[in-house]
Structures are given as structure tokens and as C-alpha cells.
Design a protein with these regions (language model features):
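Peripheral (often C-terminal) accessory segments that flank ATP-dependent C-N-forming ligase machineries
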Residues: 114-190
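Catalytic activation segment of kinase domains across protein kinase-like and atypical kinase folds
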Residues: 85-89
Length: 190
């Protein structure tokens, strides 16, 4: 390594299921909202962004993520990413799987708007639907096909099955512009 970089950064490879804890923290880092999701598929399949995820509830993960953000007096929206029992990163912003907040009927967005206007917001545990799958149509189709090509038939077929049951991440009620823009960019501008 010395030949390529005199001071390489060496990191441990972490295995296990990927999951995220989305949090909204108000003034004085008060917890105002939380939502957990697990990665179902990703692309590239060797490690990349979620193409399909599912909502679930894990109080321990929420507590760990909250204590971390609270320790540096964070305020706002953030997603803490876990792999197995390890925290990988913190995204202190709106993140890629943010549409899960709508798909799982989480009040995080409403709480954000209320808090921004100075309103009182109280956190309630498990205030969203669990077991809700959400996907990014094109990316998830490519992921499912990649699993099949790699010989991971069960995962690939499950992905094709989710085509009919998972909620579309970029489908907004009454507004097809978002989905049309996504399809146009994905199909013609890459």
C-alpha cells in the first residue's frame, strides 16, 4: 500500500443487513419523530443505494441513533445508517429513502412543518405503518434482474414479485410530474 498511498485509510468490512433510522429532532435535540426501514434490495447488488426497502420498528436502534445525534446537539432531519450492529454513517439531511415517510404514513413531514412554525410536537413511538415496502421502479427492476443474473434466484424473483405490491417511491398522489421526470431522466439522460 505504501507505494500507492503513504497513509491509507483501512476500514473493517461490515456484513449484515442494512437499515436506517430516520429522525426529526427539534430545539434542544428533542425527539419529534422516528421511522425505521430495512434494505430489501440495493443496486449495485454488491453494495449501493436502496432500490427497495421496508418499514419496521426497532426501539433499540431508534434509541442508539437518537443518543448519537443528541450527543452533538443536532436539530433537524437526519438518517442514521446501520449495518448489523454498527453505525455506518449519518446523513444530516433529506436522504434517498425519505419517500418511505409518506409510504408508511409517518407524521415526520407534518411534525417538521409544525415545528418549523413554532408549534408544539410530541413524539409518539410506532406512529407509522410497519411492513410497508417501497421501491424505486427502474432501479429496483435492474436490481432484481442483477440478482437473477448473479444466480441469486430467490432474491431476484422476490424483486419481480414486489413489482406488484411495493409502493412506488416517486409516485405522488395527484401529481404524475415527479414520476414522469424520473422515468425521462432514467431512460433517456443517462
Amino acid at each position: 500500500m505504501q507505494r500507492y498511498d503513504p497513509c491509507p485509510i483501512v476500514q473493517q468490512k461490515i456484513t449484515g443487513a442494512g437499515a436506517g433510522v430516520s429522525l426529526l429532532l427539534g430545539r434542544e435535540s428533542k425527539l419529534l419523530g422516528a421511522l425505521c426501514h430495512r434494505r430489501v434490495r440495493e443496486y449495485p447488488i454488491t453494495g449501493g443505494p436502496s432500490t427497495c426497502c421496508e418499514s419496521f420498528y426497532d426501539e433499540k436502534m431508534i434509541d442508539e441513533a437518537y443518543e448519537l445525534l443528541k450527543s452533538f446537539h443536532f436539530t433537524g432531519l437526519a438518517m442514521v445508517e446501520f449495518k448489523g450492529d454498527c453505525i455506518l454513517e449519518v446523513n444530516p439531511r433529506v436522504w434517498g429513502s425519505f419517500p418511505m415517510t409518506e409510504a408508511a404514513q409517518s407524521p415526520i413531514v407534518a411534525h417538521y412543518a409544525q415545528a418549523a412554525q413554532g408549534g408544539q410536537v410530541t413524539y409518539t413511538a410506532k406512529d407509522y405503518r410497519t411492513g410497508v415496502k417501497m421501491r424505486f421502479f427502474l432501479n429496483d427492476t435492474v436490481a432484481a434482474l442483477s440478482y437473477l443474473k448473479a444466480g441469486r434466484v430467490k432474491e431476484g424473483l422476490r424483486g419481480l414479485g414486489d413489482f406488484f405490491t411495493a409502493k412506488e417511491a416517486l409516485s405522488a398522489k395527484g401529481d404524475g410530474k415527479v414520476m414522469r421526470a424520473y422515468l425521462k431522466k432514467s431512460l433517456f439522460e443517462r
